[in-house]
């Protein structure tokens, strides 16, 4: 890990869920509250701010300029932003994102530049557009200090990407205590792969999009019994803070109270006691036990599906609904995670069920998913 990475505070400020003046308008960022949030974060020792070309429909970067860049010296903070090449209609437009981001941010360079959400068919778009070489060239020209990528795929995909692109300075991964040994996310294995390549990790989704803060009551009670004074959020963040090879842990903060709480929890961070670790293990076991579809993500069902239904993804989302008891949240995830092959396109041919080693009634489960999420 680079020396400057060693001194990066472990709490990072994610600028994807900023406070809004109008909840129905993602562009209506509450700048005055955002300024207070930035001040509180920096006063608490934070320096890392994470944004992206598309956050808040393109206004997050400009808001960060107003709340941070225009008000603090350049050596008081670091900024990460991202390129979504797979959403661009041409290589030229994808490459122009960086210049636009720099203009919006009011910066001559960004400290961290990510090729965002690499994986699956999206990787081919980054390759075809020459984005890997473009990002490295931007680093050579001083427009970018560090180049990396974010991804949601498993460990084998990460291994392939880091082997193909050994020049990466960092990688951004979904890591949290619920996904640590998840057979789809493979957070533990991904962390091991990154460490083996000597690439530090920026952690995203440490609280699973807020779901580890809104736990089912019986799960929350297990954690509170072990430490009545600890917030549910602090359990999620402490798990990530104390992992090796972590550059920083992002929190998408939406109001001043969240910043204050996260800063306080960060400043009080310590490793879990044996009792706390047992409580977390019990909480995870309970959450896992609430997942009733025994899918292991073997993916035997996918290859011959004539409709291209993303069956393991959909079954995983059904399990997530059971674990979190929050259908609205999972429905939001479904809208993009299942977009390549939604449940309603199933024609009930039964090919998948014939291939499933777990004997899952897949056709029925897809009907349930379509009813719940579409």
Predicted features and spans:
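Conserved residues at the C-terminal ends of beta-strands
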Residues: 14, 52-55, 113-116, 150, ...
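Glycine/proline-rich, positively charged
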Residues: 21-22, 29, 39, 86-204, ...
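Short, electropositive alpha-helical surface patch
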Residues: 62-76, 165-171, 263-269
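Structured C-terminal cap/extension of enzyme domains
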Residues: 39, 47, 66, 189-374
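Short beta->alpha linker loops
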Residues: 55, 59, 152-153, 254, ...
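Short catalytic-loop micro-motif centered on adjacent basic/acidic residues
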Residues: 48-55, 145-149, 172, 248-250, ...
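Hydrophobic residues in well-ordered beta-strands that form the structural core
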Residues: 50-51, 81, 203
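N-terminal binding-site loop/beta-alpha segment at the start of enzyme catalytic domains
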Residues: 1-77, 134, 140
């Amino acid at each position: 890990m680079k020396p400057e990475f060693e001194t990066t505070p472990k709490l990072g400020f994610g600028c994807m869920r900023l406070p809004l003046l109008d909840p129905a308008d993602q562009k209506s960022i509450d700048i005055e509250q955002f300024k207070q949030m930035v001040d509180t974060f920096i006063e608490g020792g934070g320096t890392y701010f994470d944004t992206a070309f598309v956050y808040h429909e393109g206004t997050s970067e400009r808001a960060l300029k107003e709340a941070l860049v225009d008000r603090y010296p350049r050596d008081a903070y670091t900024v990460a932003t991202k390129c979504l090449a797979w959403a661009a209609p041409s290589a030229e437009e994808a490459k122009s994102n960086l210049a636009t981001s720099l203009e919006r941010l009011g910066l001559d360079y960004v400290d961290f530049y990510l090729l965002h959400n690499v994986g699956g068919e999206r990787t081919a778009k980054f390759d075809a557009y020459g984005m890997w070489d473009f990002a490295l060239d931007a680093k050579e020209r001083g427009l970018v200090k560090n180049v990396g990528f974010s991804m949601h795929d498993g460990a084998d995909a990460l291994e392939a990407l880091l082997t193909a692109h050994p020049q990466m300075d960092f990688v951004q991964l979904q890591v949290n205590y619920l996904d640590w040994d998840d057979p789809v996310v493979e957070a533990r294995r991904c962390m091991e792969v990154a460490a083996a390549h000597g690439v530090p990790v920026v952690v995203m989704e440490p609280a699973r999009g807020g779901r580890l803060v809104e736990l089912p009551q019986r799960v929350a009670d297990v954690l509170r019994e072990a430490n009545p004074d600890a917030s549910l959020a602090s359990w999620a963040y402490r798990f990530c803070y104390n992992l090796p090879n972590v550059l920083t842990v992002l929190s998408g903060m939406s109001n001043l109270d969240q910043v204050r709480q996260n800063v306080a929890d960060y400043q009080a961070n310590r490793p879990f006691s044996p009792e706390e670790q047992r409580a977390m293990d019990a909480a995870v076991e309970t959450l896992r036990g609430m997942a009733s579809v025994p899918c292991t993500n073997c993916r035997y069902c996918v290859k011959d599906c004539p409709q291209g239904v993303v069956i393991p993804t959909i079954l995983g989302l059904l399990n997530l609904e059971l674990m979190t008891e929050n259908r609205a949240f999972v429905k939001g995830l479904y809208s993009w995670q299942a977009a390549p092959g939604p449940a309603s396109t199933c024609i009930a041919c039964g090919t998948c069920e014939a291939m499933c080693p777990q004997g899952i009634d897949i056709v029925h489960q897809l009907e349930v998913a379509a009813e719940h999420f579409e």
